[in-house]
Amino acid sequence: MESTPFNRRQWTSLSLRVTAKELSLVNKNKSSAIVEIFSKYQKAAEEANMERKKNNPESLPQHFRRGTLSVLKKKWENPVAGAEFHTDSLPNSSSEGGHTADYPPAEVTDKPAPGVRADREEHTQPKPRFGSRPEAVIQSRYPRSENSHDFKAQATESQKMENCLGDSRHEAEKPETSENTETSGKIEKYNVPLNRLKMMFEKGEHNQTKSLWTQSRNAGGRRLSENNCSLDDWEIGAGHLSSSAFNSEKNESKRNLELPRLSETSIKDRMAKYQAAVSKQSSPASYTNELKTSESKTHKWEQKENVPPGPEACSVHQEGSKVSTTENSLVALSVPAEDDTCNSQVKSEAQQPMHPKPLSPDARTSSLPESSPSKTAKKFQAPAKESCVECQKTVYPMERLLANQQVFHISCFRCSYCNNKLSLGTYASLHGRIYCKPHFNQLFKSKGNYDEGFGHKQHKDLWASKSDNEETLGRPAQPPNAGESPHSPGVEDAPIAKVGVLAASMEAKASSQREREDKPAETKKLRIAWPPPAELGGSGSALEEGIKVSKPKWPPEDDVCKTEAPEDVDLDLKKLRRSSSLKERSRPFTVAASFRTSSIKSPKASSPSLRKGWSESEQSEEFGGGIATMERKQTENARPSGEKENVGKSRWQGEEVPRSKDRSSFELESENFMENGANIAEDDNHVHAQQSPLEPEAPGWSGFVDTTAAKEFTTQNQKSQDVGFWEGEVVRELSVEEQIKRNRYYDEDEDEE
């Protein structure tokens, strides 16, 4: 239509004529059947306008013509060949289509709907979509068929329609989305009888709805002026129709209007809009909330379009949706006072989307994070920073290990002694230091070495030899504890990271000490072998001596010299036990053997004490009754060595009883020498004085021994013991030494025998 300055007469109710050309522009890709069907209606409407023009020859220009429903009904039911005249008006209406291009409306597309009512419905529903209030939209769509001359008369009819529309407008919102899903090319001709339309217009109720119609008309005019729309309004009043018929027609009109844009929207958006419409119908009180939801839906819908409309069109489109809701509330409540308030709200809300739209591309989603910022902050709150006790680096949750009320890295949780990796089930701790269980038992439980854990001087330092070198080595080992403690306040004594260094220094000290003392390798381990094993022989004694040197000096060094002698005695006693059979066989010759062993110190420690157990009795017999014994031996010279041995045994045993006194007296004298501290020279003089009566017999005795030594000792494999045995004075001197040594441990020897 031509663009004309705004005139309130335009708001009466203008023609519903949307030209076929306009429809073809809007629905380029759709079938031409829509245009053909609509052109049929246009012909009927045009004829009705012509009749009205005849009745009112001085009427306003052609685009203000209006027709009554009765005439339209007749023309629709009985189409007359007036298409030529109707098409003459198409250029005029094409200008109307060009003016309303702001709102891409596929309006009224496939409504073969019955009569004017169907056309009116088709054009009312698009308007909530594309701009300004429903009245304004409707008026802008159909500007021509009304005659403003009959403004008041038409107003009454349109009031009826508005009243009916107000009741049914909520219902019209529901099928909004379902009809969108239908195929656009589907065309249906509705069988709604026009009698009902006629009845609706011919009924009264003019006074009842007049005030409401006036208010809505004025509000629509204001809204339309804001949107630069000079179109007139055609109010639809199909409220008295059955809801099913009205809804179906409404759906078809809505579908045709939204074809250009809704084809690009998703089903979800349309369903959301449908639910919003349902909620609007249910509670007018929730009007404000509904406006917000519809506004957000509109934002989202527009953002999903491939080619969004211009800012003016978008704002008009949003305003249209809001205006529809306000109009619904106004009509349903039929309260005139609410209209101005709602209009002001609509204006403010229509102005708002112009600015927030570019700012919030996701109007609905952006509002959600704002509503719950506190929850998200709590969820993602960073944990407190923790540092590892050992390496002093940050510990993150995935590598955190809490043990002994301290925080470690899993890889740093190691034994402070052997540096083996530990777990919560394999560690033991003492005052902040972590140990593996074997070393904890070895270092503390077996030795009672708890002082080491408390930072005191370690027992190993006390056990080691107290030399200056060791003390200098021991002192530097301690300062790291004091120097490193400030770095880790969580640990009581010293940081676990440095315990390995202490252990290494102690091991280095111990190894150097071992090298100086020729310690065997076993001494590194903290083992105690006490008392020494009794089964070891001569080779075992050397090993025991090595162990004694290598192990810690305990008991103190003052007692070491005392402990050596008992060990020698034990070794002698063990060897005597082993040679018990030899002692019995060689008893006749033990006097010489005892003197020889005392005089000659063999490298072995066992030789001087081989016959110690019975040498004392034989020596006493030698001094007390040596002559008689030797004479008997000479008489038995011719006998075999085995027989002599047996006889000698029996005789020696028989003679031991009467001669015990001599033996005891000699022993007392020798003990007196020891007690008085007499030197070896005095002992020798005393022995010579004591043995002087026996000297005349000595040559014979020695000769006897020389003759029999070769036989007796060779048979017993003792040649080495017989060589150089009788050397006179030397033998006697060393025999006293042997006696002194023997008398010291006399009681033990007596028990062994």
Curated annotation (Swiss-Prot):
Tagged with keyword Zinc: yes
Keyword terms, alphabetized: Acetylation, Actin-binding, Cell junction, Cell membrane, Cell projection, Cholesterol metabolism, Cytoplasm, Cytoskeleton, LIM domain, Lipid metabolism, Membrane, Metal-binding, Phosphoprotein, Steroid metabolism, Sterol metabolism, Ubl conjugation, Zinc
Region ranges (Disordered): 46-66, 82-186, 276-326, 341-379, 467-493, 505-669, 682-703
GO BP terms, alphabetized: actin filament bundle assembly; cell migration; cholesterol homeostasis; cholesterol metabolic process; intestinal cholesterol absorption; negative regulation of actin filament depolymerization; negative regulation of cilium assembly; ruffle organization
Modification sites for Phosphoserine: 15, 132, 225, 230, 242, 263, 348, 360, 367, 372, 467, 485, 488, 599, 602, 607, 615, 692, 720, 735
Main location: cytoplasm
Polar residues bias (residue ranges): 278-291, 342-351, 363-375
UniProt-listed SMART domains: LIM (SM00132)
Record field: compositional bias (Basic and acidic residues): 46-56, 143-152, 167-177, 292-305, 512-525, 554-565, 630-666
Gene Ontology cellular component list: actin cytoskeleton; actin filament; brush border; brush border membrane; cleavage furrow; cytosol; focal adhesion; ruffle
Domain of life assignment: Eukaryota
Residue(s) carrying N6-succinyllysine: 437
Start and end residues of each stretch annotated as Required for interaction with MYO5B: 491-511
PTM characteristics: Phosphorylation of the C-terminal region by MAPK1/MAPK3 reduces its association with F-actin and contributes to actin filament reorganization and enhances cell motility.
Stretches assigned to the LIM zinc-binding domain: 386-446
Assembly: Interacts with NPC1L1; bridges NPC1L1 with MYO5B. Interacts with MYO5B; bridges MYO5B with NPC1L1. Interacts with PXN; this complex stabilizes actin dynamics. Binds to G-actin and F-actin. Interacts with LUZP1 (via C-terminus); both proteins restrict ciliation and may work together to regulate this process. Binds RAB40B (GTP-bound); interaction influences LIMA1 subcellular localization in lamellipodia during cell migration.
Record's function text: Actin-binding protein involved in actin cytoskeleton regulation and dynamics. Increases the number and size of actin stress fibers and inhibits membrane ruffling. Inhibits actin filament depolymerization. Bundles actin filaments, delays filament nucleation and reduces formation of branched filaments. Acts as a negative regulator of primary cilium formation. Plays a role in cholesterol homeostasis. Influences plasma cholesterol levels through regulation of intestinal cholesterol absorption.
Listed name of the protein: LIM domain and actin-binding protein 1
